[in-house]
């Protein structure tokens, strides 16, 4: 099959719609269940490239959670702590390596991952399928599925859950095309290989140390950015992206957005948040929304009398600004990637507040000296990769 008709394009009025191979060859995908749409396939093809490159760079199973053609989260399989199992709501499950990777990718920013598209570098097993079964998700792409996993996935969304199988050996044409306003754009594919050598070739700060964990996390950040709508910045820790700032016109706004998401990820681990007394059988999306509001400055929206009773068995004490500030002071050993250079040191100042210790960015700003000086002030390690990672 070299063509697949779709219901419509980005919006219901955009018809007809299809995906097809310009060279007449077979499509590299097979729809095993459901009817994926135009945006579903944009997410699928972008996200699978991301996880395939993460697997190649780290040697570990990888997963991504995509929304609107940018990753909400991405991760490689690592051992989850009891704390992370609890905040990702998987402490009651036995997790395989690929299931752990998806739990991390989904868990980093659960608000943004609501209704996500899932990508796996490895075969989807029944543990991953059971994890997905209880989450709100639009679909999944993977190189294969075990029979048990496929059976579970086919029960989601009353049997309409989108399941796509992709040829893991598929190699796209070296030249890609895109039409905008009736004009065809042509460019070479971004086949840049992101690896440790790129990180080590030009460390510009006084501190030259890059731990093995930092190298892994910087690779995760940069590969995530390669498939994130620009401008973009990514914070990573423990084998996963913990904050992605996508599609901002200003670099500092990317850094703030991603940093705020990373802060929320860490605040979810605060003892007060982990011990919230939720009512029995609260829906997972309601729990996620409640936690998000509880952590924010608008906590009264879920703690006001007549409201808290919907969510909690007993009224919790608020998480105060002072408590949040003190907790965030313990945030550390975070890695940060940027898809283009930092024009000023203010980005580093903001990153420091979210525990950043390691930075990878292209360099090339006329104020590189200011950025380096700011890193040196905090004894950070910063690598200039010399490579821009814009994606549109």
Labelled PLM ranges:
Residues 53, 227, 264-268, 353:
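Conserved helix-loop functional segments at active or binding sites
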Residues 1-198, 214-232:
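Active-site loops and adjacent core secondary-structure elements that bind or stabilize anionic groups
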Residues 220, 228, 235-238, 245, ...:
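Nucleic-acid 5′ end/cap handling module spanning
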Residues 70, 124, 237-240, 342, ...:
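Active-site-proximal loop/turn and secondary-structure-junction residues that shape catalytic pockets
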Residues 57-65, 163-166, 230-237, 267-278, ...:
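Flexible, glycine/charged-enriched surface loops at secondary-structure junctions
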Residues 116, 120-121, 134-164, 169-171, ...:
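C-terminal binding/interaction regions
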Residues 174-210, 268-291:
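Substrate-contacting helices/loops that form the catalytic groove of nucleic-acid
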Residues 72-111, 242-341:
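Glycine- and Gly-Pro-enriched alpha-helical subdomains that act as flexible
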